[in-house]
C-alpha cells in the first residue's frame, strides 16, 4: 500500500504543480529534492545516534549538492538525483542502521521519488525547461559535437 500511496501522491503533487504553474520556477524540483533528502536527517534526530545523524547529513549533502548543480546548470541532474534517491530508499536499511525510519518509509518514499523523477524527465520535452537561461546543456553540446565543451 505504501508504494501506491507514494505513486499517487507524487503524481498528484506533480500535476498540481504543473497545473498552477509552480514548476515554471526552476527552483521547484531542486527544493523538492532537498526536502526529500532531509527526511532521513529528521528521522535520525528523532531517535538515532550521532553517528547515524552524521551519515544521514553526509548523504543529504550529496543529494542537495546535485540538486543545486541541477538548478544552476541543467534540471535533468535533479531528475537523476530523484531517481537515485528512489534507489537509495530501497538500499538505505542495508547501508545506514536507523531505528527511527518507519518500516513503510522506503516503499513510500522510493515510489514517490521514482515517479517524481519520471515526471520531471517527461517535462524535458518542453524546450528551455531544463537548462539555465543563457547556457547550453553539456548533454546537448555532446549530442551536437561528440565532445564535452
Give residue spans per PLM region.
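Structural signature of hydrophobic alpha-helical transmembrane segments
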Residues: 1-10, 50-58, 107
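N-terminal signal-anchor/start-transfer transmembrane helix
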Residues: 5-22
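Hydrophobic, membrane-inserted alpha-helices
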Residues: 11-15, 36-41, 58-66
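Membrane-water interface at the C-terminal end of transmembrane alpha helices
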Residues: 13-17, 68-76, 103, 111-135
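Membrane-helix interface "capping/anchor" motifs
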Residues: 20-29, 68-80
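Cytoplasmic-side transmembrane-helix entry/capping segments in multi-pass membrane proteins
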Residues: 26-35, 54-59, 78-84
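Membrane-helix boundary connector in multi-pass membrane proteins
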Residues: 72-80, 88-104
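Short, highly charged, low-complexity non-transmembrane loops/tails of multi-pass membrane proteins
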Residues: 129-149
